[in-house]
Amino acid sequence: RLGTWIGGDRDGNPFVTLKVTEEALKIYSNQIIQIYKEKIVNLSESFSISTLYADEPRLLMSKIKNYSNLLNKEYRHYTKINFDEPFRIFLSLVFHRLDNFQKNKKGYNSFSEFQDDLNLFENEVNKCFKNNSSSLDLRYFIDYVNQFKFHGVEMDIRENADVLRFNEDFKKEYSEFTTLIKRIPEWKKIYGDTVISSIILSMTKNEKDILNLFKFCKKLIKNKSDIPMLVPLFEEIEDLEKSHVIISNLFANKDYKKHLTNFNNNQEIMLGYSDSNKDGGIVTSQWS
């Protein structure tokens, strides 16, 4: 797993807006999709097998036919030059759906659509070929895709607890953070369910801060399984010293404990003792 908070760290940085976060997600997505496109080209050469020498993949041919409207120009081109190579035709059409992702209606609407196409392709390969050296390469690629999805890296969203304490000084930040949280389910659908791995709450002072964030997310996110891991970041000496008590109190909340079942009952925490800008000072932070 690769993670980043570049594009998602809003704490104290007014330049990290919702637009910046969305642009960062697109940049990461474009990078991983470029890798997928290159691999699809290689696989299409490996599976350039004529139906004269293999069973006809009927489900795959049906899906190719379904793509004749969406990818009409591409469909006519590949069915003409590779007329007896359905596996190659299908992967060529998959390439164009990847190439048009987030550009126009020809592209995939979600990661799950791409995943379904790959699973269909693999199932048809396994039915039509008993022993094919390229099948293992295909399986490795699908495992790779299932790991990195359409996001490549998992982004952390980071915000200061003061924003959720209804402080008048943070009205603008509160409003934009609200809009961002609402977008998480959409991002998960487009890029894959692990695109936003966690929401980090800096300057967490007590369990109420995390429970406040939890309540905030429940109000804005319809499907509760779409709520990411909520991570307290303890930064000041007093908060670090009582962090174990705060976590124990947090776990005592039944609703929150149920939320953790979505993460195999794991809870991430962050310790900010290395930050010399907090009350511990530079000597304490370096000593730690």
Where are these regions (language model features)?
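Extended active-site and interfacial segments that coordinate phosphate-rich ligands
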Residues: 18-42
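Extended, charge-enriched "interface" segments that sit outside catalytic cores
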Residues: 45-190
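Extended, Lys/Arg-enriched charged tracts that mediate electrostatic binding to polyanionic substrates
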Residues: 1-2
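A conserved P-loop NTPase coupling/switch region
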Residues: 223-227
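Expand to "…catalyze enediolate/carbanion chemistry for C-C bond making/breaking, isomerization
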Residues: 7-10
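Active-site cores of enzymes that catalyze phosphoryl transfer or operate on phosphate-rich substrates
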Residues: 130, 135-215, 219-222, 237-287
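Conserved, mostly hydrophobic/aromatic
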Residues: 12, 149, 232
